Swiss-Prot record:
This protein's name: UPF0391 membrane protein LPC_1949
GO CC, one annotated term: plasma membrane
Keyword set, alphabetical order: Cell membrane, Membrane, Transmembrane, Transmembrane helix
Transmembrane helix keyword on record: yes
Signal sequence segment: none
Organism of provenance: Legionella pneumophila (strain Corby)
Chain ranges passing through the membrane: 5-25, 30-50
Protein family: Belongs to the UPF0391 family.
Locations listed in the record: Cell membrane
Membrane topology (UniProt): Multi-pass membrane protein
UniProt cross-references to InterPro entries, sorted A to Z: DUF1328 (IPR009760)
C-alpha cells in the first residue's frame, strides 16, 4: 500500500510541474484532440459490434 502511495505522489509531483509550468495549455489542446479522436473511434467500434453480432459460435 505504501508503494502505491509513493507512486501516486510522484505522479502528482510530475502533474504539478506540468500544471504550474507553461506546458498545460499545449497539453490541454492535445488532450481535446485525443478525446474527440477516441470518442469517434468508440462510436465506430460500438456500431460495428452491434451490427456484426451473430449467433453463438459453432461448437
Amino acid at each position: 500500500m505504501l508503494t502505491w502511495a509513493l507512486i501516486f505522489f510522484i505522479i502528482a509531483i510530475i502533474a504539478a510541474a506540468f500544471g504550474f509550468g507553461g506546458i498545460a495549455v499545449a497539453a490541454a489542446g492535445i488532450a481535446k484532440i485525443l478525446f474527440f479522436l477516441f470518442l469517434v473511434m468508440f462510436v465506430i467500434f460500438l456500431i460495428m459490434g452491434l451490427l456484426g453480432r451473430r449467433g453463438p459460435p459453432p461448437v
